[in-house]
Amino acid sequence: MAATQEDVKLLGIVGSPFVCRVQIALKLKGVEYKFLEENLGNKSDLLLKYNPVHKKVPVFVHNEQPIAESLVIVEYIDETWKNNPILPSDPYQRALARFWSKFIDDKIVGAVSKSVFTVDEKEREKNVEETYEALQFLENELKDKKFFGGEEFGLVDIAAVFIAFWIPIFQEIAGLQLFTSEKFPILYKWSQEFLNHPFVHEVLPPRDPLFAYFKARYESLSASK
């Protein structure tokens, strides 16, 4: 179906990996949309209307029907616009893609955040080890494939934009070595291929202001020790 700017909206914030997932999917599908930037310190009535349960972004609105949660949104986009498929057609491969995408959210996003934004050294060490373990699983899963989706990127790659783009920012700020080419050569090579893909590169947020924002947050936390 043809989509216009009037019937597709995305409520989000610049710099969110979860919002970025949706933007990559929309770019891949060639869907035009209106981006409504939110201020999470002063949430809009529109956000509260469209996502009263979690009150967070991203929220995707298609013909006034709101959908929340980034991976759910990406699947909806894939089912609605059939070109450039994001999920495999094979049921087993599709189930695996969902498994690894959820694995990234469950085992990596939280552990990385706790590795960086904590004042408890034991907690930091624990989460660094959990991050290493989780990334190793993905390294093994990727093997000799160009993308997790094969020759073209898919759901797992989109979910893993957090690894490719956000982890390098976080580890530089905190002086950690969470994700390096030496420790995870296969995954690191994938990250460069993925970030340089035009459908991804064109929707990534500007790195410098994002780095400055998270550095200020990290320094504020460190000062509170």
From Swiss-Prot:
GST C-terminal domain span: 90-214
Keywords, sorted A to Z: Stress response, Transferase
One annotated GO molecular function: glutathione transferase activity
Binding of glutathione, residues: S16, K43, V57, E69, S70
Alphabetical GO biological process terms: glutathione metabolic process; response to abscisic acid; response to auxin; response to cytokinin; response to gibberellin; response to heat; response to metal ion
Induction annotation: By heat shock and auxin; by heavy metals like cadmium, silver and copper.
E.C. numbers: 2.5.1.18
Annotated Pfam families: GST_C, GST_N
Annotated GST N-terminal domain residues: 6-85
Gene Ontology CC: one annotated term: cytoplasm
Role, per record: May play a role in the cellular response to stress.
Stated name of the protein: Probable glutathione S-transferase
Organism: Glycine max
Gene assigned in the entry: HSP26-A
